């Protein structure tokens, strides 16, 4: 319908609306592509070049495609027949040379492929070894960290146990020291108490020793000690002596009624001597020499201090003191009476 040389009105309209800069390179590239395609088709199908393609304003029919397919099938069959004929016509020597040439090329290619494969495999092996080394190092680090953590935990536990044991030992030592201190304090306190008691007893004994002594019925000195032990020891002796002296007292009263007043001291003194002193030499000498008896001193202060007690005893025993100048005091075994005017001693026993 239209011209194919590019001078149609439609091409002119397209050229008007296109930019002049892009027009030239597009045309050049399109022409080059067309030339290349045509050359390839000519080589494959071995046919002369076709005319250049132009813009057409009609649909392409399917008949040319079918024609091209038929041409391709026929060309392949022709090529196969020609190859068979050439093989038949070729000599065996030429075939062997071609085979060896082909084998040498194949061998070179095979060796090159093997070398490439070995290099690639070696590279892969080296990378795998490096990865394994990294994994092993990582495992070693993790195991070392775990071992160090466990050892640190065990050491902390051991330290805690040691601290607890040390605290327990200190507590036990403190308890033992406290018990020892308490025992020592108790011993010291008991010793101090005993010392104070001994001092008090010693002071009391010194005071009693410093007190004025007095004569009992036997002519011996005795102090005014009043200890619980002495009282416990002396009390049964008092009872026995009281029983003895009751008899002597009655006999003494009989003798006193029969004998004159002047010899009363000697008779009373003779009867007042106990039995265990009757056979000694001192008692015999005392009977022979009555003037050797130590002179008794009147302790006015002691008697004055004991006057209330004497009055109570007199009231209890119904003793009547007719003579105001006579004094008496309680001895260890009875009541001792002293008369100032007559200078006589009277030893009277009584029982509480």
Curated annotation (Swiss-Prot):
Record's keyword terms, sorted: Calmodulin-binding, Cell membrane, Membrane, Nucleus, Repeat
Region described as Calmodulin-binding: spans on this chain: 140-164
Record's subcellular location: Cell membrane; Nucleus envelope
PROSITE patterns given in the database record: IQ
Entry protein name: Protein IQ-DOMAIN 15
Alphabetized PANTHER family for the sequence: IQ-DOMAIN 5-RELATED, PROTEIN IQ-DOMAIN 15
Lineage: Eukaryota, Viridiplantae, Streptophyta, Embryophyta, Tracheophyta
Subunit structure: Binds to multiple calmodulin (CaM) in the presence of Ca(2+) and CaM-like proteins.
